């Protein structure tokens, strides 16, 4: 095997007992690859490990976990200054793995690990909310956010992405739309939103294609709003084709401003952020990510 620069894997603490992962790492090490492994225990560990990765001079920092882990590692990488910033590698080990799935990361651990180490590094966008919090995949608001943040961990562990749908059906009687106003470049909408998706990536909530036209290197955010007064009829209508769906509002812009008369919550790659005012903007070519050559989210 050709020689590859060293990499550092930042592994979510929930995946430490993953025997196939241990075996995959050992095999690659036996083939001559240098792979450092660090395990997260609490919030902020990823920043510290990225700093260590730079001191070690690795070419890639691999995020081993779900969308939240990818978010934390990618956010730490874009905060780095200077040259020779490591590329991001992705090893999907979470419940839903929405970003990894949509960009075409292999499900097989050994193949995903090889791609994370040796794949082509391509500049991709990220998004930033209120000049502080970032997301690499999607910001979701409304019905979808409450479901993904409230779904019990045991249900997610047992059923994966399907758990979000099941929990949503159980909660329909208590969920109401969010009234808000959204502005962007050549875009303005005001009304009641059941679901809001602002995507750099395409899917969230365990495989739901909220922003099917999103690309991760076009300098734009894709917006999709699901409107309606009643949740069940709206969800039924969303199963139809987009052309027949009167409850979908779409837009594209490098930024969006959201204002609400009451507190609403957005889910940023799994992390909730509540408030009444949100400014969401794209950060073009914010970091390099090792992706498959046929990644469908590249223009």
From Swiss-Prot:
GO MF entries: ATP binding; lipid kinase activity; magnesium ion binding
Gene3D superfamilies membership: 2.60.200.40, Probable inorganic polyphosphate/atp-NAD kinase, domain 1
Record key words, sorted: ATP-binding, Cytoplasm, Kinase, Lipid biosynthesis, Lipid metabolism, Magnesium, Metal-binding, Nucleotide-binding, Phospholipid biosynthesis, Phospholipid metabolism, Transferase
EC assignment: 2.7.1.-
Pfam families recorded: DAGK_cat, YegS_C
Transcription regulation found in the keyword field: no
GO cellular component: cytoplasm; plasma membrane
Major localization class: cytoplasm
Binding site for Mg(2+): 215, 218, 220
Active-site residues per Swiss-Prot or TrEMBL entry: 271
Domain DAGKc: 2-133
Residues that bind ATP: 40, 66-72, 95
Signal peptide residues on this chain, from the entry's feature table: none
Protein task: Probably phosphorylates lipids; the in vivo substrate is unknown.
Assigned protein family: Belongs to the diacylglycerol/lipid kinase family. YegS lipid kinase subfamily.
Protein name, per record: Probable lipid kinase YegS
């Amino acid at each position: 095997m050709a020689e590859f620069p060293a990499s550092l894997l930042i592994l979510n603490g929930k995946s430490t007992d993953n025997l196939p992962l241990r075996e995959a790492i050992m095999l690659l090490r036996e083939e001559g690859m240098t792979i450092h492994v660090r395990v997260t225990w609490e919030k902020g560990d990823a920043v510290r490990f990225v700093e260590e990765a730079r001191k070690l001079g690795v070419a890639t920092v691999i995020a081993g976990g779900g969308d939240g882990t990818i978010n934390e590692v990618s956010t730490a990488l874009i905060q780095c200054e200077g040259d020779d910033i490591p590329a991001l590698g992705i090893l999907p080990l979470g419940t839903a793995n929405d970003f990894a799935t949509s960009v075409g990361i292999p499900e097989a651990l050994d193949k995903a690990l090889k791609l994370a180490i040796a794949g082509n590094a391509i500049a991709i966008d990220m998004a930033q909310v209120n000049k502080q919090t970032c997301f690499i995949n999607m910001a979701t608001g409304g019905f979808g956010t409450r479901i993904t943040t409230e779904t019990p961990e045991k249900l997610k562990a047992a059923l994966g992405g399907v758990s979000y749908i099941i929990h949503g059906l159980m909660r329909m009687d208590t969920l109401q739309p969010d009234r808000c106003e959204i502005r962007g470049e050549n875009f303005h909408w005001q009304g009641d939103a059941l679901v809001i998706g602002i995507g750099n990536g395409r899917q969230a909530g365990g495989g739901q294609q909220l922003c099917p036209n999103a690309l991760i290197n076009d300098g734009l955010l894709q917006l999709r709003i699901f409107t309606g007064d009643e949740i069940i009829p709206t969800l039924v209508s969303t199963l139809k084709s987009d052309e027949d769906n009167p409850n979908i509002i779409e837009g594209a812009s490098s930024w969006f401003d959201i204002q609400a008369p009451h507190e609403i919550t957005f889910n940023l790659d799994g992390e909730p952020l509540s408030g009444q005012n949100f400014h969401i903007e794209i950060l073009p070519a914010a970091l390099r990510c090792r992706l498959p050559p046929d990644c469908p989210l590249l223009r």
